[in-house]
Regions:
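Amphipathic, small/basic residue-rich leader segments at the start of a protein or domain
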Residues: 1-126, 150
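A generic local secondary-structure boundary/capping motif
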Residues: 84, 152, 179-181, 202-205
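Short, glycine-/Ser/Thr-/acidic-enriched flexible segments
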Residues: 92, 99-102, 144-145, 167-171, ...
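Extended, hydrophobic alpha-helical segments in both membrane/secreted and soluble proteins
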Residues: 92-93, 97, 105-106, 110-114, ...
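Active-site catalytic microenvironments for nucleophilic, acid-base chemistry
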Residues: 117-120, 138-141, 217
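Internal maturation/activation junctions in enzymes
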Residues: 131-132, 143-188, 195
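Conserved small/polar residues in nucleotide/adenosyl-binding loops
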Residues: 213-220
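Hydrophobic alpha-helical segments, chiefly the membrane-spanning helices
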Residues: 224-230
C-alpha cells in the first residue's frame, strides 16, 4: 500500500533556521507561535495527514464521488466525511485565520505547511478544505463587512464549504472568453446568468452549504467574484 511520510523535520528546519520565525514575534500571531508550539502543530498535522488522510487516497481512486440522480446529491468516497469533520472540529481549518472570525490567528506559514501535508497525502480530499480556505481569504481581501460576517466564520469552522467557478463550456484556460455575468438589481443583489462546468467541490456531503464563486465580468480582462449560498 502506498505510504505518505510528511516532511516534518524539513519544515521545522525551514521555519526555525531559514525563515527564523522567532524574529517576527513582535508581529500579530507570531508572538504565540513559539518554537515549541510550531513543532507541536507540525507533529500533530503530520499524524492527521499520515494516519487519517493518506489512507483515503486509494479509496478515492477506487470509488470517486457518487451522484444520486433521484435527489441530485453527491456522496464523497468513504472516509472523506469523517476526515473533514475531524479536520474542522480540531481547528485545522481555521489555523491561520483571524481569531475575530473564528480562527486561531496563527501565522499563515503554519497553515500552509499543514495544508501541504493534507494535499500531499490525498489531493482529492485536500481540495475541499483548500478551496474553502481560498474562498474565505478572497472574502477577507475584497468582501464587504456584511459578507465577511455572514460567510467567513461558517467557512473557518468547516460548516460551509467553498468552491470557485471558472470553466465554461466554450472555454477553460482562456478566461478572457468568459460569458457569465452579474447584473445589479438595484437592491444590493445581483442576477447571475451563465453556465459553468467542471466545478471542483461544487456539490458534496461534507459541509452543510457551499459558497459558490462565479466570474461574471464581461470580456474586460478582469474577473469578479460573487458569493452565493447553494
Amino acid at each position: 500500500m502506498p505510504m505518505y511520510k510528511a516532511p516534518v523535520q524539513e519544515m521545522k528546519f525551514l521555519m526555525s533556521e531559514v525563515l527564523d520565525l522567532d524574529k517576527y514575534s513582535n508581529l500579530p500571531g507570531f508572538s504565540d507561535a513559539t518554537s515549541d508550539l510550531r513543532d507541536a502543530i507540525l507533529d500533530e498535522g503530520a499524524k492527521f495527514a499520515e494516519g487519517v488522510v493518506a489512507p483515503l487516497n486509494r479509496v478515492a481512486d477506487m470509488q470517486g464521488c457518487r451522484y444520486n440522480g433521484e435527489d441530485h446529491s453527491v456522496k464523497t468516497p468513504d472516509g472523506f466525511k469523517n476526515a473533514y469533520d475531524t479536520m474542522s472540529q480540531n481547528g485545522w481549518m481555521g489555523l491561520g485565520f483571524p481569531a475575530e472570525h473564528g480562527g486561531q490567528g496563527l501565522p499563515g506559514v503554519l497553515s500552509i505547511a499543514v495544508s501541504e501535508m493534507v494535499s500531499s497525502a490525498c489531493m482529492a480530499f485536500g481540495m475541499y478544505p483548500g478551496l474553502t480556505a481560498g474562498a474565505a481569504e478572497a472574502l477577507l481581501s475584497g468582501g464587504t463587512e456584511e459578507q465577511i460576517k455572514k460567510y467567513v466564520p461558517n467557512m473557518v469552522s468547516g460548516q460551509w464549504g467553498g468552491t470557485m467557478n471558472l470553466t465554461e463550456p466554450h472555454c477553460g484556460t482562456d478566461l478572457g472568453m468568459l460569458k457569465s455575468k452579474a447584473v445589479p438589481n438595484g437592491d444590493g443583489s445581483y442576477s447571475i446568468t451563465g453556465q459553468k462546468i467542471w466545478i471542483s467541490s461544487g456539490e458534496h456531503d461534507l459541509a452543510e452549504n457551499c459558497l459558490l464563486y462565479t466570474s461574471p465580468s464581461p470580456r474586460d480582462r478582469s474577473l469578479s467574484r460573487m458569493p452565493s449560498s447553494a
